[in-house]
């Protein structure tokens, strides 16, 4: 499954070792339970990873017994995630569905799971980061019957942000507060490429990036030739944006929208759109 290659090597090492005889169990990191042994007949890494994804939680009572060793649970869950890199997508999807159906019956274990989804799976600095995996869990948790509605809404909202911001997604049209190109909205811009720059108060790197982009001779030339438009995007109170219009680069468009609808985990947050306004 194509998730994040950054931890593929680690996963490969684990699945090759899984099921082999051990002279001694490592003292650390601790896990919740002893992992199942992979049958010797499964020799290919993908087959071994599939087995671990399918059977890792078989003997864990996720439904009735609340986890008390948080570190061990974290180690076990991230090991589970690491197998995804080598496993088939269909196997991963089926396993996540089964896991959620079980863990949804225990609020404590479910909350621990959600905590790791946000600390590791959604974290761009984590080796387990994967928007695809987060969305799989979010969709299954949202479909579960016994899960708190507020938690479902939180996960669904985050999944929607990821969907809005994914490569290939079409950015919804929004009005422009200022447009040197004479366009009323984003869709009115006819350049082959449009850059959305999301302003962020207090972000020094964002300010530096904006200064450099506005001073770029290459970017200015492309704008003059009609090949590029740059939209300076603000969030918050539209009235507060009025005072900032005069400070914007003269050849940039300006917009004020609900910026929370777009992924800004990485700052400066910059989106490059094609002529169809696809990311």
Regions found by a protein language model. Give the residues of each.
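Thiol-based oxidoreductase modules, predominantly thioredoxin-like and allied folds used
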Residues: 223-241, 249-259
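Short, internal strand/loop/helix patches
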Residues: 243-276
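Bacterial N-terminal signal peptides
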Residues: 9-18
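Positively charged n-region of N-terminal signal peptides that target proteins for export
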Residues: 1-5
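Short active-site neighborhood of thiol/selenol oxidoreductases, capturing the structured segment around
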Residues: 184-214, 229-231
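A structural signal for short secondary-structure junctions
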Residues: 189-190, 223-225, 262-266
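Oxidative protein folding and maturation machinery
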Residues: 23-182
């Amino acid at each position: 499954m194509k998730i994040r290659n950054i931890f593929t090597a680690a996963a490969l090492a684990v699945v090759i070792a899984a099921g082999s005889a051990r002279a001694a169990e490592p003292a650390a990191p601790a896990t919740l339970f002893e992992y199942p042994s992979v049958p010797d007949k499964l020799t290919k890494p993908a087959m071994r990873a599939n087995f671990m994804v399918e059977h890792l939680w078989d003997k864990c009572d996720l439904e009735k017994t609340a986890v008390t060793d948080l570190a061990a649970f974290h180690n076990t869950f991230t090991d589970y995630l690491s197998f995804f890199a080598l496993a088939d997508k269909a196997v991963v999807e089926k396993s996540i569905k089964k896991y959620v159906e079980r863990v949804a019956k225990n609020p404590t274990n479910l909350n621990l799971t959600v905590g790791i989804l946000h600390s590791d799976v959604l974290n761009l600095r984590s080796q387990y980061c994967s928007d695809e995996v987060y969305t799989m869990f979010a969709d299954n948790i949202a479909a579960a019957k016994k899960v708190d509605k507020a938690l479902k809404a939180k996960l669904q909202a985050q999944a929607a942000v990821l969907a809005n911001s994914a490569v290939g997604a079409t950015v919804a049209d929004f009005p422009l507060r200022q447009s040197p190109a004479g366009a009323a909205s984003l869709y009115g811009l006819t350049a082959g490429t449009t850059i959305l720059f999301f302003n962020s108060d207090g972000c020094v790197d964002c300010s530096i990036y904006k200064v450099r982009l506005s001073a770029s001779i290459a970017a200015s030339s492309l704008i003059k030739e009609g090949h590029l438009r740059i939209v300076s995007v603000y969030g918050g109170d539209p009235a507060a944006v009025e005072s900032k219009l005069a400070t914007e680069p003269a050849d940039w468009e300006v917009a004020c929208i609900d910026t929370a609808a777009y992924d800004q985990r990485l700052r400066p947050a910059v989106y490059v759109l094609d002529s169809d306004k696809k990311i």
